[in-house]
Amino acid sequence: MMRRIIENSHGHPLKNQKILQSKELSCIACSQGKLIIRPSPAKMEVKPPTFLERIHGDICGPINPPSGPFRYFMVLIDASSKWSHVCLLSSRNLAFARLLAQIIKLRAQFPDYTIKNIRVDNAGEFTSQAFNNYCMSTGINIEHPVAHVHTQNCLAESFIKHLQLIARPLLMREKIPLSIWGHAILHAASLIRIRPTSYHKYSPTQLAYGQEPDISHL
């Protein structure tokens, strides 16, 4: 730009020269190169979901090195209380059985609350006919985000990042082998459940069970 001004001026004062306006300087390629993917707009809820009304789930892995026989971990998090369940998996094929077992356990522990919606990714273990048939028989609505649009399941994915941000420093501080990540992830999950969140002044455990969590073991 400065070179063009100098060449066009031929040594004459700039006040006699035409100055290009900003709209004449726009570079389409530069603008396109700086584009970013905006987060998907949050769906406006008429009212906040009740406990267990909406559960988000996701699987992280494969992780190398494995933690014993485990190479994955699965998270389930309640959209209302942020209460969570984390389990280690040796294979993604076990996700359906673990999810089914947790649903049965939650329905037995909290008979006054109904699981209405489960949002999970499009992995084969969550799109199988067996999983669809079970959810249909129990009145659970399955929600799948658009493929490769991770922001549509951001609650589960952000929870996974939260776990990792706690587990990694634990491993580094204690200078223990990375293969112990499974224990670190489970410990991080237990710490998150007993701490108040940015959404509530109470911990997820207190919101779920109605009493303060026991922290005597810490």
Language-model-detected regions and their locations in the chain:
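HHCC-type zinc-binding knuckle of retroelement integrases
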Residues: 1-218
